[in-house]
Curated annotation (Swiss-Prot):
Name the record gives this protein: 5'-methylthioadenosine/S-adenosylhomocysteine nucleosidase
Alphabetically ordered keywords of this record: Amino-acid biosynthesis, Hydrolase, Methionine biosynthesis
Catalysed reaction equations from the record: S-adenosyl-L-homocysteine + H2O = S-(5-deoxy-D-ribos-5-yl)-L-homocysteine + adenine; S-methyl-5'-thioadenosine + H2O = 5-(methylsulfanyl)-D-ribose + adenine; 5'-deoxyadenosine + H2O = 5-deoxy-D-ribose + adenine
Similarity-based family: Belongs to the PNP/UDP phosphorylase family. MtnN subfamily.
Pathway field: Amino-acid biosynthesis; L-methionine biosynthesis via salvage pathway; S-methyl-5-thio-alpha-D-ribose 1-phosphate from S-methyl-5'-thioadenosine (hydrolase route): step 1/2
Length: 232
């Protein structure tokens, strides 16, 4: 079994990279891929960089070169659901683009022409994530719609508009839908696992910097626990 793990920022991948045994680094297209084993499972770890284009290119190369059985996108996100707080975990049931709008041509808000309205995460991986969450004591989790856009959601008016169009979304970030769309194209099962570094619209630029390490730690701990369950 081979599991690919993708995070955008150094803080989001460093803890996982430190757990890789027999670590080897390969560079393709300017992206660094870290290869080795965690809990006796072959892993490919990618720091994609921020944004949808970076995530799509890095994920496409990863799948084509290494053919993983599963893709897990990890890192931080901004919370949208009123019951969530900084440090909580969100697990994707589905993923969409919140900044795509071709509705004049009959598509749903967030839908890329020729693609589904949203991308469904793998049921098996969702189940593994839910069972693994018990390892993070006193951490709230929620699963649902995660939405992606190429902007940091900090303006109250943007938050209000996005919430109007996507009332069911639980979190927003800047890479997940690109990873999901790429996995959909390659028919590779995926799940998005994010820990909240901020709550959308609540002074989140400052909060993000303060709590990024906490969010990265929670996400990494959950990924490590998921690998243990996948092995069994």
């Amino acid at each position: 079994m081979k599991v690919a793990i993708i995070g955008a920022m150094e803080e989001e991948v460093a803890l996982l990279r430190n757990q890789i045994q027999n670590l080897k680094t390969e560079i393709h297209g300017g992206f660094e891929y870290y290869l080795g084993q965690i809990n006796a499972i072959d892993v490919i770890l990618l720091r994609s960089g921020i944004g949808k284009v970076n995530a799509a290119i890095g994920t496409a190369l990863l799948i084509k070169l290494y053919e993983p059985d599963y893709v897990i996108n990890t890192g931080s996100a901004g919370g949208f659901h009123t019951d969530l707080e900084v440090g909580d975990i969100v697990i994707s049931q589905s993923v969409c683009h919140h900044d795509v709008d071709v509705t004049p041509f009959g598509y749903a808000r967030g839908q890329v022409p020729g693609h589904p309205e949203c991308y469904l995460a793998d049921i098996h991986l969702i189940d593994i994530a839910k069972r693994s969450i018990d390892a993070l004591q006193e951490v709230t989790h929620m699963h649902g719609l995660i939405a992606t856009g190429d902007r940091f959601m900090h303006l109250p008016e943007d938050v209000a508009t996005t919430r109007e169009y996507f009332p069911d979304m639980i979190a927003c970030e800047m890479e997940a839908a690109a990873v999901a769309q790429t996995c959909h194209a390659f028919e590779t099962p995926f799940v998005i696992i994010r820990s909240l570094s901020d709550i959308a619209g609540k002074e989140n630029a400052v909060t993000f910097e303060q709590y990024l390490d906490k969010a990265a730690t929670h996400s990494a701990r959950l990924i490590l626990e998921m690998l243990t369950h996948l092995k069994s």
